[in-house]
């Protein structure tokens, strides 16, 4: 069996950010490039950190008092970035990269060739390959989905939902009506729809900025889930019982759940 390498799955090019960029600039770059993270390079063009949409959201720029808001507006990418940057050689086996990401809870790796950054490999890249493979074992969504997820009512404010996400570490929250029917999903990227990161009034509800829920049958295959994520550019899907589609979702399956499955010793990715 031919070994799939990182170079076979990665996407070339790196969206860069300067250490002194403001959080407003970071948010603008994330939105313009439709990415979840930016790599930060110093003056010598060496990677020194990474900042994500979740980092921006976790910053208390959502604070209601003017003093906190002023502090956050003065903060830079350097102050919120994570370091050091996790990197991988371009000719590393893709299975090894997937295992490393799963074990370390890493969503992306900076790809280097001859010590120079040439691209990025992320969970989405593995999903694209999974969706295209017909040799995958047919595990079901219900086998690997997460039973726990963050949920809020349709009357919840954006600021309250964002703080709950920041405090709990969840990247999104499922919005439901009084009966538990899923109405949408609110994520960190939805926050970027607010221009110039102005203070968000407490009167703005999650229903005003959430995106429509993407749902899948609990008996669907992982390949079907991966294809759905790729087609809709989503990182997570609500898992439902089709006979009770208007009830509270059974769980959530994320792109990271799929990569974790790839890292299992008996996965086709770990063979050959």
What is the role of each PLM region?
Residues 30, 38-54, 101, 109-124, ...:
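A glycine-centered beta-loop-beta connector
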Residues 1-13, 52-85, 98, 122-150, ...:
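Tandem CBS (Bateman) regulatory domains
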């Amino acid at each position: 069996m031919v070994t799939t390498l990182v170079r076979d799955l990665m996407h070339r090019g790196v969206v860069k950010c300067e250490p002194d960029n403001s959080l407003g600039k970071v948010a603008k770059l994330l939105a313009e490039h439709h990415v979840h993270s930016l790599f930060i390079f110093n003056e010598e063009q060496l990677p020194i950190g990474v900042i994500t949409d979740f980092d921006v959201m976790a910053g208390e720029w959502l604070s209601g008092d003017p003093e906190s808001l002023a502090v956050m507006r003065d903060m830079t990418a350097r102050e919120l970035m994570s370091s050091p940057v996790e990197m991988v050689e371009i000719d590393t086996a893709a299975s090894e990269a997937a295992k490393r990401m799963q074990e370390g809870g890493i969503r992306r790796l900076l790809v280097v060739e001859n010590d120079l950054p040439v691209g990025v490999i992320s969970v989405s890249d593995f999903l694209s390959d999974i969706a295209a493979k017909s040799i995958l074992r047919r595990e079901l969504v219900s086998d690997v989905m997460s039973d726990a997820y963050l949920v809020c009512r349709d009357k919840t404010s954006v600021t309250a939902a964002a703080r709950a996400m920041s405090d709990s570490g969840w990247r999104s929250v499922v919005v439901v009506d009084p009966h538990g029917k899923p109405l949408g999903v609110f994520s960190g990227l939805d926050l970027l729809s607010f221009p110039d990161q102005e203070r968000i009034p407490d009167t703005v509800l999650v229903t005003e900025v959430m995106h429509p829920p993407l749902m899948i049958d609990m008996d669907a295959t992982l390949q079907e889930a991966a294809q759905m994520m790729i087609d809709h550019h989503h990182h997570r899907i609500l898992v439902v019982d089709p006979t009770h589609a208007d009830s509270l979702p059974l769980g959530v399956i994320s792109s990271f759940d799929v990569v974790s499955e790839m890292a299992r010793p008996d996965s086709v990715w770990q063979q050959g």
